[in-house]
Amino acid sequence: MLQLKKAGSQALENLRSEGSFPPSWQSMEELETTTNDIVSRYLDERFKVSRELGGGSLLTELLDRVLRTSDTECMDDTKLSEAEKLELVLALDRQNHKMQLYPRYVELLLSLLEEVTTGEQRKMRVLELASGSGGLALALAEEALRKNLPISVTGSDIVPKFVEAGNRQAAAKQLPVNFQLLNAFNLPLFPEGSFDLMVISQSLHHFTPGQLAIMIAQAAQQTKTAFVGIDGYRSILLTGGVPLMASIQCIPSFALDGLISARKFYSELELDLIAEIATGKRDHTVICDWPLSILTVRFDGRRPN
């Protein structure tokens, strides 16, 4: 319901009709500013279109505007200690295991990697951004090991305790995963093509449109195959469902994070717009695999499935 695809598609057409779209940019700073500005203009234009359409479109647009928030999740609060943040990401890890989300993510990523491994006798290299306590990176490495697939997995986060926790788990499980301290939208200058796949899951909404565009642009420079972003699907159902599921663990701040996150999920057309600005191309898809939105940006010339 909160996808507003009819009004959103018309709003995108209106923006494109203004010319010089997608816009050019010369630096990551300019990309960030430009993307934030255009996404803001897109939402304003969508509101105008919704008013013209009237009825259900306008009501849904108004509801979307009421629900949207720029509040910061507790786990991103600079006043929170790293130990308290770790408690929250471990709660998220437990929830992902209970909901069997990691197997879904791993299946998606392995299908992409198996395309690359066909005919190539080398390790496939994966970098996960904002990996938290490392659940996905560990699950991916474990499944690759089980299938005897030649995959090298690097997890990363900006919080030192997350990195330490990930490396401890990797050592305990004897998995070939290395966790590094990295800023997801200010990556070091890895050599071109250092990775085959760059991934970020359940964190897209933690970043502004401009920061997401930077991540995609960096991936285009350093990744051979694709950037994959996985997050919750923007909908009324998940706005209530995510905090409800989070509340089961009886951690008030985690339940609050669930509510804030669900209100911040990007719509498919917003993700589509951000990817186009970042790459200047249409070599990407955004699909719904309920309850997920999956953005896949290809860098190898192949059209995403």
Locations of regions flagged by a protein language model:
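C-terminal alpha-helical "lid/dimerization" subdomain adjacent to the S-adenosyl-L-methionine
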Residues: I230-T279, V286
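A conserved beta-strand element that flanks and buttresses the S-adenosyl-L-methionine
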Residues: V199
